[in-house]
């Protein structure tokens, strides 16, 4: 399976025109995507294989008295592409971006019954 993992930057909106089923919770609005990508400290990694088949969104939380932290907001992979290590690759790429931005910690949360996410 040939999947490209890459960060989205402002102006990359066209890459998100084709999105596989169940990658995001709701339909992606172009205005929200543009605002998200333009916001300082907001980062998005996508998995591309004939369109977006996975996404990982994170925000940097900066503190006055301690090291910055990376908060992973969302991770989603289309069911047709799950169990191929895509989520792990996106998380690893996001952790690397966090380190580059000076984050000393990363936080990832999920629901107790989300067995696939807990396996990461």
Across the structure, where does each feature detected by a protein language model lie?
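Conserved GNAT acetyl-CoA-binding A-motif
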Residues: 98-110
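Conserved beta-strand in the GNAT
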Residues: 51-60, 71, 76
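A conserved beta-turn-beta hairpin within the catalytic core of GNAT-like acetyltransferases
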Residues: 61-72, 82, 101-104
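A short beta-loop-alpha structural element at the N-terminal edge
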Residues: 2-16
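Residue-level recognition of the GNAT/N-acetyltransferase active site
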Residues: 78, 111
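Conserved acetyl-CoA-binding loop-helix of GNAT-fold acetyltransferases
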Residues: 77, 83-96
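Conserved active-site alpha-helix within GNAT-family acetyltransferase domains
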Residues: 88, 112-120
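Active-site rim helix/loop that mediates acceptor-substrate recognition in acyltransferases
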Residues: 24-49
């Amino acid at each position: 399976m040939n999947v490209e993992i890459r960060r989205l930057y402002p102006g990359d909106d066209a890459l998100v025109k084709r999105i596989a089923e169940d990658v995001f919770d709701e339909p992606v609005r172009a205005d929200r995507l543009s605002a998200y990508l333009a916001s300082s400290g907001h980062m998005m990694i996508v998995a591309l294989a004939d369109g977006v088949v996975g996404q990982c969104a994170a925000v940097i939380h900066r503190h006055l008295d301690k090291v910055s932290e990376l908060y992973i907001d969302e991770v989603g992979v289309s069911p047709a592409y799950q169990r191929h290590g895509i989520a792990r690759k996106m998380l690893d790429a996001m952790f690397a971006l966090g380190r580059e931005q000076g984050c000393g910690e990363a936080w990832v949360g999920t629901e107790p019954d989300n067995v696939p996410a807990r396996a990461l």
